[in-house]
């Protein structure tokens, strides 16, 4: 499946919630009619079946983290093999993606922008350049912006935006050095309450 390259707000309208695909901290409902489905007249949201609700939740989370269908299914399989709660394991695996960590540290305005920084070899992990967005960051790993990329205007703009967002408690960042440490795996209470990961578990358990 190819990565979606169309209007970002359309995806948020389709899911009926902000997927944080656009930069900035302005509420998305001030940018578009989030409660109205995409389309010229805004298709009516019909009553979904249980399967439909589960599918929508999976699509919402998959798009939020910018993960393709096959990748997402593989993350679920890995989460199911791990000890503990499968849904929480899934969210932790998604949070460990390097592109997500770069975004969480405030070095990029969106996960898509973070993915681009990583792909363009602008990110270093434990002193080594890593250009794989799905690279798994582990506790105590140090992530930084490569020296020659530190003067990029978009990174400075992203840091300013990050100051207006709630800072992740599982990450420590030195904005002066453009360096951060992934201190621990996030607990479920650290993450968005708008995600219902149990619906995803139910979907894949069929």
Swiss-Prot record:
Keyword tags: Ribonucleoprotein, Ribosomal protein, RNA-binding, rRNA-binding
Function of the protein: One of the primary rRNA binding proteins, it binds directly to 16S rRNA where it nucleates assembly of the body of the 30S subunit.
Coiled-coil portions: none
UniProt protein name: Small ribosomal subunit protein uS4
Domain S4 RNA-binding, first and last residues per copy: 96-157
A GO biological-process term: translation
PROSITE patterns: RIBOSOMAL_S4, S4
InterPro entries: Ribosomal_uS4, Ribosomal_uS4_bac-type, Ribosomal_uS4_CS, Ribosomal_uS4_N, S4_RNA-bd, S4_RNA-bd_sf
Cleavable signal peptide: none
Organism: Idiomarina loihiensis (strain ATCC BAA-735 / DSM 15497 / L2-TR)
Any single Gene Ontology cellular-component annotation: small ribosomal subunit
Keyword Ribonucleoprotein found: yes
Record Gene3D superfamilies: Ribosomal Protein S4 Delta 41, Chain A, domain 1 (1.10.1050.10), RNA-binding S4 domain (3.10.290.10)
Entry-linked Pfam families: Ribosomal_S4, S4
Self-association and partners: Part of the 30S ribosomal subunit. Contacts protein S5. The interaction surface between S4 and S5 is involved in control of translational fidelity.
UniProt-listed HAMAP family: Ribosomal_uS4_B (MF_01306_B)
Family the entry assigns: Belongs to the universal ribosomal protein uS4 family.
Gene name per UniProt: rpsD
Alphabetized GO MF terms: rRNA binding; structural constituent of ribosome
Cited NCBIfam families: PRK05327.1, rpsD_bact
